[in-house]
């Protein structure tokens, strides 16, 4: 065992080296973990209560986040909702539109304050990532969305001829940029969201042939990776009015990973938060469902999920009351699984059965 004298000498040496490090690199360059003022990671709401639950509270601040999936699966919608939630809490948001496809009308419909949203439409991948770096270093921006990694075309590729080969250029660009900006992201508390597309690996016989663009660097640097898929198209008669999306938390460094959340995305309106509330209210027994009928405190208020959503949208006070009770249940540690929210197709089957019985 070390003697008391040895321990004093060690402590003296430790204090000396800590002072030297702080003097050289600045105060806060090294701290004891127990002395940290912010042990809990702050979060931004994703706009979907079910996804917030799966993420352990929401999208973490001061981290790199990747959202990937097939085309028209809801990637940009999810990012715009995160921007809207940031702006609601008084934050400043920026959108780096590398795809040159941002629709201001749709963004406004989702609740984004387009008058104060910072937008950049860069010509090259280098320019886009330099813009992100400057915004992060400013410590004035709370969230930056890059749409998308696949559209971050290196300058050499743009200036070259159409048939030229540029093997690994984009991957090297992403790797260099992430090495440069990740440290600043943590210090500034700015959340950087990269949207990404899927590609197919050639010659894969066993395992998943899908991969994301931009190399492997983003997979390592991202604290959260969300895999979003369209599982169902929502229809009224023959008219399509939205999609049912399923998000798998493929990676999470701030909460348990591999959770799954489901929610509706309505065309022109975005994520149906009321739908999320109904699903979680049913799980926490705030609302009961028998067959297709939904009831609250013993009284039926709607038949079928669509009518229940319509009822709550037209009765805002009732919806807020249900949401408050759901959040209270969740804060008290209610056993709710993000993997088992109500499935639209299952409910519709129940509704069809009930309607058939009524006709008989």
UniProtKB/Swiss-Prot annotation:
Keyword annotations: ATP-binding, Cytoplasm, DNA damage, DNA recombination, DNA repair, DNA-binding, Nucleotide-binding, SOS response
Coiled coil: none
CDD domains with a match to the protein in the record: RecA
Gene Ontology biological process terms in this record: DNA recombination; DNA repair; SOS response
Keyword hit for Metal-binding: no
GO CC term (a single one): cytosol
Subcellular location: Cytoplasm
PROSITE patterns: RECA_1, RECA_2, RECA_3
Transmembrane segments annotated in the record for this chain: none
Binding site for ATP: 69-76
GO molecular function, one term: ATP-dependent DNA damage sensor activity
Main location: cytoplasm
Lineage: superkingdom: Bacteria
Primary role: Can catalyze the hydrolysis of ATP in the presence of single-stranded DNA, the ATP-dependent uptake of single-stranded DNA by duplex DNA, and the ATP-dependent hybridization of homologous single-stranded DNAs. It interacts with LexA causing its activation and leading to its autocatalytic cleavage.
Family listed: Belongs to the RecA family.
NCBIfam families: tigrfam_recA (TIGR02012)
Name by which UniProt lists this protein: Protein RecA
